[in-house]
Amino acid sequence: AIEEGVVDLEKDTFYDSGSVIVSGARIGCWKAGGHGHQTFLQVLESSCNPGVVKLGNLLGKERLFSYLDLFGFGSKTGIDLNGESKGIIFPLDRVGELELATTAFGQGVSVTPIQQVTAVSAVVNGGSLYKPYIVKSFLEPETNSVIKSYDKTFVRNTISKETSDKMKYALESVV
């Protein structure tokens, strides 16, 4: 939403009454009665599901799902491990209001831990997504010389450096 310019984390606001109704389903906030009036930075800091649903709606399903794809969700990362799963993402033609809402706050998808780490790494790496790997190099045990090594493999840009900087600030403000 930041990259697309649909929200300013510190200026735009949301009122959390404690829940939101989406396609007849109640999506609640963890805090009974809600958080009240918040900036979207505070929505992220307080992990407010209704606020994140609003962000998903502002972004729209096409843009949200294009970012899921851009960050590698729903695809194998190519990591050097057998048995990697691609995770489960709704097909875009089956995404209604409820699927958009739950996907926005992370409960409408199934991702692997390595996909999550790869995506977060891209967010804090200036937007650059790299292929993950488990082993950087193999060393000969007696001489400690490198037998084989792997270089960083750039895959694609996901977000701008400016958005990355804003996201780093937001992530740091949570802890």
What are these regions (language model features)?
Residues I2-V175:
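Beta-lactam-recognizing serine transpeptidase/beta-lactamase-like catalytic domain environment
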